[in-house]
């Protein structure tokens, strides 16, 4: 189930994105990217519709996934 990111409290959204970024451990190449920069990138992707927040009823978990998968 897709959860509209606009319906999530700002502090909760920030923590959700932070947990996602830290869990993913994405390699940004030779350039070091700050945690806040990574969080801002995910926020931009949410606003543009590139990614969505997804709740799994089966596993009772929340994740951020590429919107095209749905």
From Swiss-Prot:
Matches recorded under SUPFAM superfamilies: YehU-like
Family matches, as Pfam families: UPF0270
Gene3D superfamilies: YehU-like (1.10.10.610)
InterPro entries named in the record: UPF0270 (IPR010648), YehU-like_sf (IPR036685)
Top-level taxon in the UniProt lineage: Bacteria
Family: Belongs to the UPF0270 family.
Annotated NCBIfam families: PRK04966.1
Listed name of the protein: UPF0270 protein VS_2853
Organism: Vibrio atlanticus (strain LGP32) (Vibrio splendidus (strain Mel32))
């Amino acid at each position: 189930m897709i959860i509209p990111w606009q319906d999530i409290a700002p502090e909760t959204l920030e923590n959700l994105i932070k947990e996602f970024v830290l869990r993913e451990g994405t390699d940004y190449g030779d350039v070091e990217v700050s945690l806040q920069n990574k969080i801002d990138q995910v926020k931009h992707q949410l606003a543009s519709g590139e990614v969505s927040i997804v709740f799994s009823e089966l596993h009772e978990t929340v994740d951020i996934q590429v919107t095209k998968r749905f």
